[in-house]
């Protein structure tokens, strides 16, 4: 019988992810249940860590509503930015672009920057 270790709703908190992973035995199937991004201080580090675990350890990663909002914003930044911003998107955008979390965000221009500068992470999501 397969054992599973599931993690969800990390919301950009890399430290919390590291703490949770300390409880994983390394043998159980690791499953991420989505909502890896938004609100927290380091969505980029969370995505990089989870992507590495998927590629190197065979972890499974499901998308949550926050990943969906992120991708919707990238597809149509003019229409979707306000909704995404209200759900913690600015912290993810700034984290991905390597800026201070309180830096101003420019919905359309930053969508292009995220697509260009973090294409591997966007593809992963």
Model-inferred region functions:
Residues 39-125:
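Active-site neighborhood of divalent metal-dependent phosphoester bond hydrolases
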Residues 1-49, 59:
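N-terminal active-site segment of His-dependent metallophosphoesterases
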């Amino acid at each position: 019988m397969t054992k599973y270790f599931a993690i969800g709703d990390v919301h950009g908190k890399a430290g919390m992810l590291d703490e949770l992973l300390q409880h994983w035995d390394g043998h159980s199937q690791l499953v991420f249940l989505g909502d890896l991004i938004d609100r927290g201080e380091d969505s980029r580090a969370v995505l990089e860590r989870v992507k590495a675990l998927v590629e190197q350890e065979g972890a499974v990663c499901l998308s949550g509503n926050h990943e969906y909002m992120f991708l919707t914003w990238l597809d149509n930044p003019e229409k979707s930015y306000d909704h995404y911003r209200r759900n913690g998107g600015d912290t993810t955008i700034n984290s991905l672009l390597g800026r201070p979390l309180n830096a101003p965000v420019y919905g359309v221009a930053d969508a292009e920057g995220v697509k260009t500068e973090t294409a591997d992470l966007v593809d992963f999501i």
